[in-house]
């Protein structure tokens, strides 16, 4: 096995889904500030937009079967999101990640991406998805030059996939992963690491990263709100994940200047 530039990030944090309430046209609210800053005075170059709270999966650590959703009339329209992105770019934002729920579960999402790219050719546009519904849109994503996809996949085992998501769609996800690779669209696998569930699959994730031009991010299992099924017996800490990876393959930390500014610690993998 040749040395690989592909990376694992054992300590990314999994942000809870969120949605934004509808508001009046942004142009009437205020004059945009010169730049965006967070509470620590750092300049914000990257924003996340949740386009929907709906999802076609029922992951045990996420919704746990809950069926209460934000009313359609309270969710931002695509036109409002376009205005929001316009304003954010005026304040120095360079990257937008579109999330859900499952963004492709919302009607017209691919058309929205096309309009966003047409309006902002230089904007770094990324999508986070569960990989089940993206297939019919991959050629469109390639045509508009989508910068990258984050694809959530916790297991390479079909039965485990159905156990955790409530849906027998593992084959569809693998098919769409292959289609993304064929289209040349960069993607990263997000895997929630859980003791007693997928810790035995660490070699499979490493092997996939070593043989494909993708990154893998291992995410700590954490409570995601009321009604989710969380147990501390399943918790697998970032240091322990990293130690397990080191037991399988050589790793080297990515230099600070190569990082994307996020909280994850990045490592390159290499092996025989």
Regions found by a protein language model. Give the residues of each.
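Radical SAM/AdoMet-radical enzyme domain recognition
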Residues: 78-98, 105-215
């Amino acid at each position: 096995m040749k040395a690989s530039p592909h990376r694992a990030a054992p300590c990314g944090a999994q942000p809870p889904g969120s949605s934004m309430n509808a508001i009046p046209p942004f142009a009437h609210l205020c004059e945009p500030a010169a730049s965006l800053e967070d509470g620590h005075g750092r300049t914000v170059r990257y924003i996340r937009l949740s386009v929907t709270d709906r999802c076609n999966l029922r992951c045990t650590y996420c919704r746990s079967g809950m069926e209460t959703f934000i009313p359609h009339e309270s969710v931002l329209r695509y036109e409002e999101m376009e205005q929001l992105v316009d304003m954010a770019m005026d304040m120095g934002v360079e990257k937008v990640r579109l999330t859900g729920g499952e963004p492709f579960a919302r009607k017209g999402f691919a058309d929205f991406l096309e309009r966003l790219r047409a309006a902002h050719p230089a904007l770094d546009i990324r999508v986070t998805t569960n990989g089940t519904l993206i297939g019919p849109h991959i050629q469109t994503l390639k045509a508009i030059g989508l910068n990258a996809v984050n694809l959530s996949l916790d297991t390479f085992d079909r039965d485990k996939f159905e156990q955790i998501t409530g849906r027998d769609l593992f084959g569809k996800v693998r098919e769409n992963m292959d289609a993304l690779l064929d289209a040349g669209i960069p993607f990263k696998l997000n895997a929630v690491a859980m003791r007693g569930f997928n810790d035995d699959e660490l070699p499979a994730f490493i092997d996939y990263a070593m043989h494909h031009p993708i990154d893998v991010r291992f995410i700590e299992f954490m409570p995601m709100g009321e009604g989710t099924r969380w147990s501390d017996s399943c918790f697998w800490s970032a240091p322990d994940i990293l130690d397990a990876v080191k037991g399988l393959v050589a790793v080297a930390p990515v230099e600070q200047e190569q990082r994307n500014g996020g909280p994850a610690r990045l490592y390159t993998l290499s092996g025989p």
